[in-house]
Amino acid sequence: MKVLTTALLLVTLQCSHALSPTNCDASEPLAEKVLDLINKGRRSGYVFELLRVSDAHLDRAGTATVYYLALDVIESDCWVLSTKAQDDCLPSRWQSEIVIGQCKVIATRYSNESQDLSVNGYNCTTSSVSSALRNTKDSPVLLDFFEDSELYRKQARKALDKYKTDNGDFASFRVERAERVIRARGGERTNYYVEFSMRNCSTQHFPRSPLVFGFCRALLSYSIETSDLETPDSIDINCEVFNIEDHKDTSDMKPHWGHERPLCDKHLCKLSGSRDHHHTHKTDKLGCPPPPEGKDNSDRPRLQEGALPQLPPGYPPHSGANRTHRPSYNHSCNEHPCHGHRPHGHHPHSHHPPGHHSHGHHPHGHHPHSHHSHGHHPPGHHPHGHHPHGHHPHGHHPHGHHPHGHDFLDYGPCDPPSNSQELKGQYHRGYGPPHGHSRKRGPGKGLFPFHHQQIGYVYRLPPLNIGEVLTLPEANFPSFSLPNCNRSLQPEIQPFPQTASRSCPGKFESEFPQISKFFGYTPPK
């Protein structure tokens, strides 16, 4: 018995490796590639850009290296499926939102080649800091940034109805998700800036593949006195259209996520525009123009003080190289290194009806609105518990928003969620099915099936106020091993490190240096 115990202990010690702290600045090139893989695997929200590496550890075994990274990020203005360059994503004089976040990531590399990099899992938390930075007592325009944009699906549908009136080819499209909503109040007007995704629901009413979807920005304008959001005085809307089957992978770095799936990409098709209320109507037919050379937004007009920004007549045309967002999957050990299986049974799901909180209060006080669904998170996959960088910054856990869940490809060509009218607000921002529902699609099964190999989550938390700091994501990833694949040494996935590397955090790179204070620690000078 003692011999057996000793043997088991030796095997355990061989498979377990102490994590080595590493330099955050030196880890930045790899962190950029890891974040690129995360962006390419997402189907909702906005592209993350790296602000800095805030912590970095690694574990080596043979030719494999497992990285444990904490990445401070900022949301760009580019939707995750857009092919535009960052400078071209936002129209001139359009209200933007500053959203910061942190992602805890476990990634594996088998060699120094970028195609051998894979993401094993990640958790992210995000919060808007726009109100804290932009609204002052002297502000001529007050801006409200709503964390629960799904409450404005009606406004998104109204804008899309206007767009479909002027663009008959889009009759079969429906609102997929309200992504951002900003309210601007000043002068005699109140404007709502609503950004949302849409998808084609029929193969019969669109002259392209059914796997077509798009992203729209709509401006709904009201008189300052009105409280009726059902009848805007004017609606301006522009949409981009994408088709994931137009092009295959053109990226130098193929994302590997651990399981075999078709490789898909998408291509931005020509922008169509629609405006009403004494504006010139503009409707462009679908097409795919070549990208312009040397696009520069330096001539973008600045917002005049006291004036509410208006939607421009058209958005900048497509620019930038095609980017692959659909991950490829491969079980084979002959052509590519194997990548880790994500553990099963660890998905946060929506569990409470609208208006009922699963927790008592929010870390930042009340929501902008009074009725939100809240999540029931299992251990290990929610932003609760202890954090590797110290105590919880607020003394509370981040309640409220759940991670993004369902995928555009989880639905058929014309398969809106059953037994609901545009979701009826039941599950906000694509969070998964209630407990007890199958994650696989089938008759009578969950409204929002998770993709069967989703390995990461993004939690949208309430906006931050002056003096508050971002709630960090949970880093207690479940323990799991990489497939053997006849390799002599395989690193065991270790618990996420609980102490920060002495060579961290890295240099804070941002055009918004004032946002560093929302991360709860002072960046190195």
Swiss-Prot record:
Modified residues (Phosphoserine): S438
Main subcellular location: secreted
Coiled coil region boundaries: none
Site feature location: Cleavage: R439, K440
Keywords recorded for this protein, A-Z: Angiogenesis, Blood coagulation, Chemotaxis, Cleavage on pair of basic residues, Copper, Disulfide bond, Fibrinolysis, Glycoprotein, Hemostasis, Heparin-binding, Metal-binding, Phosphoprotein, Repeat, Secreted, Signal, Zinc
Subcellular location(s) per record: Secreted
Signal peptide bounds: 1-18
Mod. after translation: Proteolytic cleavage produces several HRG fragments which are mostly disulfide-linked and, therefore, not released. Cleavage by plasmin is inhibited in the presence of heparin, zinc ions or in an acidic environment. Cleavage reduces binding of HRG to heparan sulfate, but enhances the ability of HRG to bind and tether plasminogen to the cell surface. On platelet activation, releases a 33 kDa antiangiogenic peptide which encompasses the HRR. Also cleaved in the C-terminal by plasmin. N-glycosylated.
Cofactor: Zn(2+)
Entry keyword annotation includes Phosphoprotein: yes
Chain's role: Plasma glycoprotein that binds a number of ligands such as heme, heparin, heparan sulfate, thrombospondin, plasminogen, and divalent metal ions. Binds heparin and heparin/glycosaminoglycans in a zinc-dependent manner. Binds heparan sulfate on the surface of liver, lung, kidney and heart endothelial cells. Binds to N-sulfated polysaccharide chains on the surface of liver endothelial cells. Inhibits rosette formation.
Subunit structure of this chain's protein: Interacts with THBS1 (via the TSP type I repeats); the interaction blocks the antiangiogenic effect of THBS1 with CD36. Interacts with HPSE; the interaction is enhanced at acidic pH, partially inhibits binding of HPSE to cell surface receptors and modulates its enzymatic activity. Interacts (via the HRR domain) with TMP1; the interaction partially mediates the antiangiogenic properties of HRG. Interacts with kappa and lambda light chains of IgG molecules. Interacts with ATP5F1A; the interaction occurs on the surface of T-cells and alters their cell morphology in concert with CONA.
Protein name listed in UniProt: Histidine-rich glycoprotein
Organism: Mus musculus (Mouse)
